[in-house]
Regions:
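Periplasmic alpha-helical coiled-coil/stalk elements that build and connect Gram-negative outer-membrane
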Residues: 6, 31, 139-254, 358-361, ...
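Bacterial N-terminal signal peptides
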Residues: 9-23
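Acidic, low-complexity, intrinsically disordered peripheral segments
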Residues: 26, 225, 413-451
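Bacterial Sec-pathway N-terminal export signals of envelope proteins
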Residues: 26-77, 83, 108, 225, ...
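Small/polar (Gly/Ser/Thr/Ala-rich) solvent-exposed segments
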Residues: 48, 71-95, 106-135, 263, ...
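Amphipathic alpha-helical coiled-coil segments
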Residues: 49-64, 136-160, 170, 177, ...
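Hydrophobic, lipid-facing positions within transmembrane beta-strands of outer-membrane proteins
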Residues: 99-105, 251, 310-316
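Short, charged, amphipathic alpha-helical segments
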Residues: 123, 186-195, 397-405
Length: 451
């Protein structure tokens, strides 16, 4: 018979194992920035929409190519007459019924070759859609990065708020003890309780903001269920070290050659020029070539029945007057060409401003980071010193509240500066058009190291 102690030990072990398994099963998934990039590229509806646009343009090229090939069609006919009819001589002029079938091969082309222009436009449109897809992916990755760092900032904000509540709780308890022994007045305790209540409300607000930012990130990436974020060394692989320069001109030159939006508009300019040429082709005549094989059978056969015939035809169509339609279409195509040129120049100016703004933001964040780190160190030392002075009656409640406020402000500003500095680097990568290339290159390097 088993001893009761052994049975109890087995039961406790079973419960612990079960609890551990359930905890690991329902534990929140952890994602790094690398993981979020991969998931976003796979699940994003916006990226999939852009991929469908690319698929549509590829099919448009197939349709433009199909126009260049002749069309082969078959036809057939069966006719039942009320009766056959004959001449007085007995010759049949209307059969009882007849059947016919045949094959038709025809091709229509404009002398201007506008069908070839349409095929050329369709090929250029594919390249444009590829650049558009690249730009969508890159912009989406930056959106993921921004949401990722928003969550990390709010996590730190929650930690700061919790630490603030703990400090103020200790201060309130210390104030309560000193009130009991008569060292300080009750107003000091009331002030401490008021500050603690405010800190607790800030903690609730920070926790709610954290939940909101996590929901936004989950929506952008396509995550389901609860999750946590982790900062890994691989995340820093996406942060190149920019040298502080006097101007942002080198970055602008890179953007002019790398930005997918600019490449897309450059192709759009070519398409607009080809579209004008395509529309002008309406002034040229269209030539149609047709070849037909025809077979007919009648019962009873008429005297003029030709059972088989093969013939070809050539037709030239030249529209002389269409109410000014062709001229209006050419003018419209030219106007669209001018629009594309204006959009292209406007995009260049916008990119230059984006570079300037991102570069100055990067310089600002990098410049203030060291100062805020020093300020945080001083604020911590100051709070520790004032706390000790308060314990010995050398500082009052206002002094410790001021020291605590300075510490909380320094912590928040330092955390914001750390993550804003990282995001400013990614923003520079985005506005120069190198973010997606950098991400894919780093992911390839990381995967090769894992293998």
């Amino acid at each position: 018979m088993l001893k009761p102690k052994f049975i109890i030990a087995v039961c406790i072990t079973t419960v612990l194992i079960t609890f551990t398994l359930l905890k690991s099963l329902y534990a929140a998934e952890e994602y790094s920035l690398t993981d979020l990039y991969k998931i976003a590229l796979e699940r994003s509806e916006r990226i999939k929409l852009s991929e469908e646009d690319l698929y549509i343009t590829e099919n448009t090229k197939d349709k433009a190519l199909a126009v260049l090939f002749p069309r082969l069609s078959a036809f057939g006919n069966y006719t039942q007459y009320s009766e056959d009819k004959r001449l007085p001589t007995g010759a049949i002029i209307q059969p009882d019924h007849s059947t016919s079938w045949g094959l038709s091969l025809n091709q229509s082309l404009s002398i201007s070759g506008r069908e070839f222009d349409a095929f050329k436009i369709s090929k250029e449109d594919i390249k444009k859609s590829q650049y558009d897809l690249y730009a969508v992916r890159e912009e989406y990755l930056f959106g993921v990065s921004s949401a990722y760092y928003d969550v990390l900032k709010m996590k730190k904000a929650v930690d700061i708020a919790k630490a603030n509540v703990e400090r103020l709780t200790k201060h309130k308890d210390a104030a309560a003890i000193r009130v009991k022994v008569g060292e300080i007045t009750k107003t000091v305790l009331l002030r401490a309780e008021a500050e603690l209540s405010g800190a607790q409300s800030e903690l609730i607000r920070a926790e709610n903001n954290l939940s909101l930012t996590k929901a936004v990130l989950a929506r952008i990436v396509g995550l389901t269920g609860d999750y946590e974020l982790k900062e890994t060394p691989e995340d820093d692989e996406y942060l190149p070290d920019y040298k502080m320069e006097d101007t942002s001109n080198p970055l602008k030159e890179v953007a002019m050659s790398e930005r997918a939006e600019l490449k897309s508009l450059d192709i759009q300019k070519k398409i607009a020029g080809d579209q004008v040429k395509y529309t002008r082709g309406l002034y040229w005549p269209t030539i149609s070539i047709e070849g037909i094989y025809f077979n007919k059978d009648e019962e009873p056969a008429t005297a003029f029945l030709i059972k088989e015939s093969t013939y070809a035809g050539l037709k030239l169509i030249f529209p002389f007057f269409e109410g000014g339609l062709r001229r209006a279409e050419v003018m419209e195509a030219k106007a669209k060409q001018r629009q594309v040129n204006l959009i292209y120049e406007d995009m260049k100016k916008k990119i230059n401003i984006d570079i300037e703004q991102a570069y100055l933001d990067y310089k600002t964040q990098k410049g203030v980071l060291k100062s805020l780190r020093d300020r945080l160190t001083f604020a911590k030392d100051n709070y520790s010193a004032v706390s000790r002075q308060f314990e010995f009656g050398l500082a009052n409640s206002i002094d410790i509240m001021d020291a605590n406020t300075l510490l909380v402000t320094a912590e928040r500003q330092f955390v914001d500066a750390v993550y804003n500095q990282r995001l400013s680097i990614l923003r520079l990568e985005r506005v120069t058009g190198r973010l997606l290339k950098s991400v894919t290159a780093k992911e390839t390097a990381i995967n090769s190291q894992d293998e």
